[in-house]
Curated annotation (Swiss-Prot):
Belongs to the EMC1 family. This is ER membrane protein complex subunit 1. Gene3D superfamilies: YVTN repeat-like/Quinoprotein amine dehydrogenase. GO terms for biological process: protein insertion into ER membrane by stop-transfer membrane-anchor sequence; tail-anchored membrane protein insertion into ER membrane. Component of the ER membrane protein complex (EMC). The gene is EMC1. Part of the endoplasmic reticulum membrane protein complex (EMC) that enables the energy-independent insertion into endoplasmic reticulum membranes of newly synthesized membrane proteins. Preferentially accommodates proteins with transmembrane domains that are weakly hydrophobic or contain destabilizing features such as charged and aromatic residues. Involved in the cotranslational insertion of multi-pass membrane proteins in which stop-transfer membrane-anchor sequences become ER membrane spanning helices. Residues 1-22 form the signal peptide. GO terms for cellular component: EMC complex; endoplasmic reticulum membrane; membrane; protein-containing complex.
Length: 993
């Protein structure tokens, strides 16, 4: 009988699944996806006027080709997100791109047109140092791979190993450079810090060591990043101690030659490590005799070393970035500098945005007061500036600086030099520039969106007419006649807006669909009828804030925080929504530095992206916890409480009205702190003088298990039904404790027989342990969702070697203790806890539950899979009350018979083929429709859509036949009128009889 009911259920479910799928005409109608590659690490641009792509490798372990005309991704390969997938080096030769990844363990060759893999080989173990192309007889044939102890030569066409040789004295010498220029030999250069340089020359054909030279360099610590090889194998190294350049011809010389810089009227910057920046356009030819010498953070010099003579071609005392590029026989140098005034790296920008902090990647550039830069080309042979090669561009965000410059040079029809420039800024913005007076910026890409750390959705404001109509209520001072006239004028304004909307619809209906432009303008943003269109406020790891319109993905505003350091943590809070007109909405961003522990507050308008006039408090101590209270000030802004490391409380805003409310509500304000290293959870309460008092403490032995996650409930969550009606018509009441915390622990012992996952349900007010359970032979990573009266968490079962879900549900029983008010201090009995586990056939990347405005709609779990798909799983499938043997009462409740396997159906994927690479999180928000939940999945890509867990029961479908129903209604009305007339005639005739 049970099997029969189970088969019936699965047949019923299978038939209903396609109804939740996306139809062909709905693709892209209410969803969108934006793909990114991340911060550029290496870039190679094709040098031809008709080139249509540029190949990049990024810090997100992505190799991709971008369309140079539009900036769109032509193809993309996403490697592992760990250090194993990191790209260590990249070289471009013809139509092939060579990459080395995984710390020098894997080398690949890619075809640049379609992104196909030509070949892949596994390299010998060892610390990777350098990669170079080796030419022979006017053609590039080999790839040289330099490691800590070996030098290997591989065939460019197949990747097969030609030879590998061990480097002499590799245990003490740090080999860091490899060089070849088609002469049949290849050099490996190593250094013993502050001692000497070792130069080993190998024969390309058989790998035999031809020559080995040792040169004393007591001032040199590193070769890479400081020295360079110029002209015909001449090693040039800057010597800050003697203020000179040291040169060594690798072919003929055995000792360094010193060339003082004073003879060229040049000087190194104090405390700055100078660098030599050479260029070798073709691996079969020698390097150019010209090179850049980086003297200070904003000082470059173009020098030439030829036949033992060093000469200054051009001095660039105020320069941001430089780059070389070659086309045909012409090699040019691109120089980026400020257009007018210059601001040093250590200066400050706008005080409201904080002061600059030095970043390792941006310390070698300067910033401009007006954020306007120019790029000019110079002929390297003479240092003469080429005419009509100036590109002037401006950066929108104050405080950001250019970090990298790549040049794409080509020859025009008149044999003059043309070029395009790829610029990457400090905030991970990619700009592709061209020489056009009308449109300098050909395209731009906001690659910081590849690393979103937190986001919130904010309702859009009402239109002016709607706001004026709302403002009528609650104002009786105008009198009856005044209110009537105001209502009349408001209705006329609404009628005018409706008429213009109808005219626009009629006008657009006459156009082809491709010509209809629905441009999103920040000045005309207004809430739609069902509140489906919202403002998405996103914060990225680089410290950049974005305002994105949710229905189209259009970036409406952006702000950059220049003093945010890497690995900082962020928390975004909405203090005031758009519901309190005329007060503007207000968001507060809390940024915490990981190293110092210090925090900063930034207050801004989430709709327009402007910094607020409200000055946030200056935080002088590290912040441990932040609380957004339901208490509001006189301007309807929620109060933010900040607790520092001395357990002192700071309120924002701290008006007299707020302090009075906090004084009254202090006994009912509780918070908790987590110290994962010590395994301590502490509960505190607020006193009336805004000090804190320890109310409870719980210690989990850190030598046995460590705290990995603490999950509370969403404060904006609504629960519609407080109980479940059972088969016998009794009610099983839910335990809806808003103060409940789900604490997940993991064993410190990594042995698969002794690992375990622990779950503790703790009351955050009293510290009472409501429930605890242990999953033996299990390990993380653990993903958890805590909502209403249930907790779902996922883990890896080491014994059965599979992923599993465990669901917990809490009930008070058939009698509700207090239906009007909840208090953690007045709960005599522990709730009943039901638990059940399920097998899931895949690991997961992220998990979240749907949420709606009133909580009436059924809940679904949105599960992000490693493949990039998002699975919408009904919570009813993870019900701990599912019976193994169905009974009459369970069938009455529509409980599904228990089956341990949770299957993945492709029809349940809400993003069909719009996969999200390397998904890190899923955000859900309610809309104005109870049936609709807004979903944003973010990772390397961003995907936004809508889901309907209980179908669209509150709105007509898109394919609703308005013409048919209208014609039927008109027909019925017409038939009623005719029937009425016929009945009157019949009655009249009957009366005359």
């Amino acid at each position: 009988m049970a099997a029969e009911w189970a088969s019936r259920f699965w047949l019923w479910a299978t038939l209903l699944i396609p109804a939740a799928a996306v139809y062909e005409d709905q693709v892209g109608k209410f969803d969108w996806r934006q793909q990114y590659v991340g911060k550029v690490k290496f870039a190679s641009l094709e040098f031809s006027p008709g080139s249509k792509k540029l190949v990049v490798a990024t810090e997100k372990n992505v190799i991709a080709a971008l369309n140079s005309r539009t900036g769109e991704i032509l193809w993309r390969h996403v490697d592992k997100g760990t250090a194993e997938g990191a790209v260590d080096a990249m070289l471009l030769h013809g139509q092939d791109v060579i990459t080395v990844s995984n710390g020098g363990r894997i080398m690949r060759s890619w075809e640049t047109n379609i992104g196909g893999l030509n070949w892949e080989i596994t390299l010998d173990s060892g610390s990777f140092q350098a990669l170079g192309l080796v030419g022979l007889q006017e053609s590039v044939r080999y790839i040289a791979v330099l490691k800590k102890t070996t030098l290997a030569l591989h065939h460019l066409s197949s990747g097969h190993l030609k030879w590998v040789e061990h480097l002499p004295e590799s245990d003490s010498i740090h080999y860091q450079m490899v060089y070849s220029y088609g002469s049949g030999v290849v050099w490996a250069l190593g250094v013993v810090p502050f001692s000497h340089v070792n130069i080993v020359k190998f024969n390309v054909e058989d790998g035999e060591i031809v020559q080995q030279v040792r040169v004393s360099t007591p001032w040199l610590q590193h070769l890479s990043g400081a020295c360079g090889v110029v002209d015909e194998a001449v090693l040039v190294c800057p010597d800050p101690s003697s203020r000179s350049l040291q040169t060594l011809a690798l072919e003929t010389e055995w000792e360094l030659r010193q060339i003082p810089l004073q003879s060229l009227d040049l000087e190194f910057g104090s405390g700055f490590q100078p660098r030599v920046l050479p260029t070798q356009p073709n691996p079969v030819d020698a390097s150019r005799a010209q090179f850049f010498l980086h003297l200070s953070p904003s000082h470059y010099a173009l020098l030439q070393y030829h036949y033992g003579t060093l000469s200054l071609l051009k001095n660039f005392p105020q320069t941001a970035l430089v780059s070389f590029a070659t086309t045909g026989e012409k090699t040019v140098a691109a120089v980026m500098a400020c257009r007018n005034e210059v601001q040093k790296s250590s200066s400050s920008e706008d005080g409201s945005m904080g002061s600059f902090s030095e970043k390792s990647s941006s310390k070698d550039s300067l910033a401009c007061f007006n954020q306007t830069y120019t790029i000019n080309l110079y002929l390297v042979e003479t240092g003469r500036r080429l005419l009509d090669t100036t590109i002037t561009f401006s950066l929108e965000q104050s405080g950001t600086r250019p970090e990298r410059l790549y040049i794409q040079v080509f020859l025009k029809k008149d044999d003059s030099v043309g070029y395009r420039a790829l610029v990457q800024t400090e905030d991970h913005l990619l700009l592709f520039l061209q020489q056009l007076a009308g449109k300098v910026v050909l395209w731009s890409r906001e690659e910081s969106l590849a690393e979103v750390v937190c986001l919130e959705m904010v309702d859009l404001p009402l239109t002016g007419a709607q706001a004026e109509l709302e403002g009528e209520f609650g104002k009786k001072a105008d009198g009856l006649l005044g209110m009537f006239l105001k209502r009349l004028s408001s209705q006329l304004i609404l009628l005018q807006a409706w008429t213009s909307h109808l005219w626009k619809m009629f006008y657009d209906a006459r156009k082809p669909r491709s010509q209809i432009k629905n441009e999103i303008n920040i000045d005309t943003l207004a809430r739609d009828e069902f509140n489906l269109q919202k403002m998405m406020v996103m914060v990225t790891a680089s410290g950049k804030l974005f305002g994105i319109e949710s229905s189209s993905g259009t970036i409406l505003w952006k702000q950059y925080l220049p003093n945010v350091k890497p690995d900082s943590s962020f928390k975004l809070m909405v203090q005031r929504t758009t519901a309190h007109f005329p007060h503007p909405p207000q968001c507060t961003l809390l940024v915490k530095d990981k190293e110092s522990g210090m925090s900063s507050l930034y207050v801004f308008n989430p709709i327009f992206g402007k910094w607020s006039q409200v000055a946030p408090p200056v935080l002088k101590r590290p912040i441990l916890q932040s609380l957004l209270l339901p208490v509001m000030d006189q301007d309807y802004a929620k109060v933010l409480l900040l607790i520092d490391d001395e357990y002192k409380v700071t309120a924002f805003p701290a008006t007299r009205n707020v302090l009075r409310q906090l004084h009254e509500l202090a006994p009912s304000i509780f918070f908790y702190l987590v110290d994962a290293e010590q395994g301590r959870l502490c509960g505190y309460r607020l006193r009336k003088d805004l000090t804190t008092e320890l109310s409870w403490e719980l210690t989990i032995p850190p030598e046995v298990q460590r705290i990995v996650k603490v999950k509370g409930k969403r404060s904006s969550e609504h629960v519609h039904s407080q109980g479940r009606v059972m088969g016998d018509r009794s009610v099983l009441y839910k335990s809806l404790n808003p103060n409940l915390l789900a604490v997940v622990t993991e064993s410190t012992d990594a042995h698969h027989e002794r690992t375990f996952i622990g779950i503790f349900l703790i009351d955050g007010v009293t510290g009472r342990i409501i429930h605890s359970s242990v999953q033996k032979k299990a390990k993380g990573p653990v993903h958890i969702v805590h909502s209403e009266n249930w907790v779902v968490y996922q883990y890896w079962n080491t014994k059965a070697r599979r992923n599993e879900f465990t669901v917990l549900e809490l009930y008070e029983g058939t009698e509700q203790y207090n239906a009007t008010a909840f208090s953690s201090l007045d709960r005599p009995q522990l709730p009943q806890v039901l638990q059940q586990s399920y097998i899931f056939p895949s690991s997961i990347s992220a998990m979240e539950a749907t949420i709606t405005e009133r909580g009436i709609t059924s809940r679904h779990l949105l599960i992000g899979l490693p493949s990039g798909a998002i699975l919408s799983l009904p919570k009813a499938l993870l019900d701990p009350r599912r019976p193994e043997i169905p009974t009459e009462q369970s069938r009455e409740e529509n409980l599904i018979p228990y089956s341990p396997d949770v299957q993945i159906h492709a029809e349940r994927f809400i993003n069909y083929n719009q996969t999200v690479s390397r998904m890190r999180g899923i955000y859900t928000a309610p809309s104005g429709l109870e049936s609709t939940c807004l979903v944003v999945a973010y990772g390397l890509d961003i995907y936004q859509t809508r889901v309907y867990p209980s179908k669209q029961f509150d709105v007509l479908k898109d394919d609703y036949d308005y013409v048919l129903i209208s014609s039927v209604l008109f027909g019925l009305v017409f038939a009623t009128m005719i029937t009425k007339r016929l009945a009157q005639v019949k009655l009249l005739n009957r009366a005359w009889r």
